[in-house]
C-alpha cells in the first residue's frame, strides 16, 4: 500500500520502500510511478490516465522520500529547483570503515557504463565523465564483531549522478554496508543487516526526528 506523506492538487510526497523502482519498471516488478498513478486515479475526480512527473530518483535497494508532480507545469517547476540545487537531498547510510574526519566533501568525476549499468570514478577530462559532489557527515560509530568498524553517515548530495553515493563512498574506501554492486565484501548477495548496523540506523532516525521536532515542517530527501 502506498505510504503518502503529503499530497495536494499539484504534487505527491510518498515513501519508497527498498526493492521497488522509483520510476516505471521495464519488467513485471512493482514500481513507484505505477503505484502513484493508481493512487491518483482512485482519489482524483479527473477523467483519464493521471499524469505522474518523476522529479528525482532513488536506487532500487534504497528507501526514502520521493516527490512526484501531478501536472507538467509543477514537474517543470520542481525539476528547475533540482537543477538550480534549491532542493536538498540528504540520506542516511551505513558505511564500512571510518572517515578520517567528521565532515568531508568529496568531488569526483563519474562515468556510466550503460552495458553493465554501473558507474566508476575516472580522471577529470575523461570523455563522458560528469562531475559529482557530496558531503559526508558522521552521525555515529559502532564496532561489529564480524564486519569491523561501521559508520552511520548523513550524505548530502550536491549533484545527482548514477549510483553517485554508492560509487563515491566505495571509491574513497567507505563502501555502503550491504551494497552487492560496489562493496567487494558482499559480492551481490542479500544479507541481513547486523544488529550493530541496525542500531546505528535506528539511532540516526531518532536523532533526525528529535532535530526536527518543534520546528517548521520539513521534507528531507
List the model feature ranges, each with a label.
Residues 1-221:
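RNA pseudouridine synthases
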Amino acid at each position: 500500500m502506498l505510504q503518502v506523506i503529503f499530497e495536494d492538487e499539484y504534487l505527491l510526497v510518498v515513501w519508497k520502500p527498498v526493492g521497488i523502482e522509483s520510476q516505471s519498471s521495464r519488467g513485471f516488478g512493482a514500481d513507484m510511478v505505477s503505484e502513484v498513478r493508481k493512487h491518483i486515479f482512485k482519489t482524483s475526480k479527473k477523467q483519464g490516465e493521471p499524469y505522474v512527473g518523476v522529479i528525482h530518483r532513488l536506487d532500487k535497494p534504497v528507501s526514502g522520500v520521493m516527490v512526484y508532480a501531478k501536472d507538467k507545469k509543477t514537474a517543470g517547476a520542481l525539476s528547475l529547483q533540482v537543477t538550480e540545487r534549491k532542493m536538498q537531498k540528504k540520506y542516511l547510510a551505513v558505511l564500512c570503515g571510518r572517515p578520517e574526519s567528521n565532515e568531508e566533501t568529496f568531488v569526483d568525476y563519474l562515468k556510466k557504463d550503460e552495458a553493465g549499468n554501473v558507474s566508476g570514478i575516472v580522471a577529470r577530462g575523461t570523455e563522458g565523465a560528469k562531475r559529482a559532489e557530496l558531503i559526508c557527515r558522521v552521525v555515529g560509530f559502532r564496532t561489529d564483531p564480524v564486519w569491523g568498524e561501521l559508520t552511520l553517515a548523513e550524505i548530502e548530495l550536491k549533484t545527482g549522478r548514477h549510483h553517485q553515493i554508492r560509487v563515491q563512498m566505495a571509491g574513497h574506501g567507505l563502501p555502503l554496508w550491504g551494497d552487492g554492486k560496489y562493496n567487494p565484501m558482499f559480492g551481490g548477495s542479500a544479507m541481513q543487516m547486523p544488529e550493530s548496523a541496525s542500531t546505528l540506523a535506528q539511532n540516526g532516525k531518532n536523532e533526525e526526528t528529535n532535530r526536527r521536532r518543534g520546528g517548521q515542517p520539513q521534507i528531507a530527501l
